[in-house]
């Protein structure tokens, strides 16, 4: 996509629980972390369960926001002053994820809905302009 759009974009793959080797400051961090709870597995279509790596999908029922907490810590450390953190989220944890980001120190947090009206995305700014 970056080549097709002739955009100056740098993509990084990072273990969010071990970012000690990460360097630099970022303007935007985008993540679609695992967010489906084990309880929700029974609601998922077989074609997803059969072909998607479960490591990329599921989180423990009792720690559903663990990736968001780690992403918030990373983003606050690595984002520029007015940088953005953009996240796909579990529709059932929209309010809790917003509260988590505010409690971590983000100044602006917007919860966005998908085309079906479900909470689906968060755009958070480290500090307001």
Give names to the regions the model predicted.
Residues 1-128:
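S-adenosylmethionine
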């Amino acid at each position: 996509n970056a080549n097709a759009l002739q955009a100056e974009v740098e993509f990084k793959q990072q273990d969010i629980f071990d970012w000690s080797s990460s360097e630099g400051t970022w303007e935007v961090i985008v993540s679609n972390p695992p967010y489906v709870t084990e309880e929700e597995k029974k609601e998922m279509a077989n074609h997803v369960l059969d072909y998607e790596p479960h490591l990329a999908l599921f989180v423990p029922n009792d720690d559903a926001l663990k990736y968001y907490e780690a992403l918030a810590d990373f983003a606050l450390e690595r984002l520029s002053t007015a940088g953005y953190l953009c996240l796909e989220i579990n529709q059932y944890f929209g309010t809790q994820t917003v509260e988590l980001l505010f409690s971590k120190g983000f100044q602006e947090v917007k919860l966005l809905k998908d085309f079906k009206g479900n909470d689906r995305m968060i755009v958070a700014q480290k500090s307001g302009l």
